[in-house]
Structures are given as C-alpha cells and as structure tokens.
Amino acid sequence: MKTFTAKPETVKRDWFVVDAAGQTLGRLATEIASRLRGKHKPEYTPHVDTGDYIVVINAEQIRVTGAKTTDKMYYSHSGFPGGIKSINFEKLIAKAPERVIETAVKGMLPKNPLGRDMYRKLKVYAGAAHPHTAQQPQELKI
C-alpha cells in the first residue's frame, strides 16, 4: 500500500471561529497553531498546507497567568543602532489586542514560506464582531 500525501489543490479547508474570552494565551495559541498546520486531520502532510481558517474573536479578553500581565515583554527592533522598542503585555493589550494572539501563534508556526501561508489563515479581532459571516464559520470549543 502506498503512503498517502495530500496535494495542495485537493485540500478542503473549513472555517472556524474561536472565542478567546477568558482563555489562557498559551493554551489557546497552541491549539490554534496546530489547527492552522492541519495536524488534527488524518490527511496531514508536513510539506503541504492542510490547515483550516481560524477566526479569533474577543482577543481583548484573553488572560495570562501569574505576573505576566506586567512582566511579559514584547520586543521589536528597527534595525538601526539603539532601535529596540519594548512594550509589556498590559500596554499591548490596551493598544492592539490582536497582536498578542498573532505574536503567540506566529512563534509556534514554521519559520519558512509554508509557515507564512499558514499564518495568513489566522484572522484575529478585538471584539465580538468579525466580517467573515459569509464563510459560515463553525464554532470551535477550545
């Protein structure tokens, strides 16, 4: 019997909506990253993007454990000398709540062109409203 490998043109992708309200950041991000890769499907193939589309709502209500609210730092660098910037979780969740989940999930995906394609299937929104109702996303309990 031959080993099955998925073809990019035959992959069926579903849409799922995840409510992040009250969820722990890391536990939610690992499940989302796994589903973006397609590891929950029997036809998973490492070199083919077999994952689903994930819409995350209520990103502003995500939580972290311990003192990470004030201690967890996010860094960015402009590329110029002395160009490092840092912001803590508390300020970032107030400024751009979507970036918290996006950063966590992006770090869990492969760092190559396939990983970038997987990341594009993640849609994160701060509130409960999202513009993807036409895709009829199914609710995903995590």
From Swiss-Prot:
Gene3D superfamilies linked to this entry: Ribosomal protein L13 (3.90.1180.10)
GO terms under biological process: negative regulation of translation; translation
InterPro entries: Ribosomal_uL13, Ribosomal_uL13_bac-type, Ribosomal_uL13_CS, Ribosomal_uL13_sf
UniProtKB keywords: Ribonucleoprotein, Ribosomal protein
A GO cellular component annotation in the UniProt record: cytosolic large ribosomal subunit
GO molecular function: mRNA binding; structural constituent of ribosome
Coiled-coil annotated spans: none
Subunit structure and binding partners: Part of the 50S ribosomal subunit.
Function: This protein is one of the early assembly proteins of the 50S ribosomal subunit, although it is not seen to bind rRNA by itself. It is important during the early stages of 50S assembly.
Family: Belongs to the universal ribosomal protein uL13 family.
Protein name: Large ribosomal subunit protein uL13
Originating organism: Pseudomonas fluorescens (strain Pf0-1)
Lineage: Bacteria, Pseudomonadati, Pseudomonadota, Gammaproteobacteria, Pseudomonadales
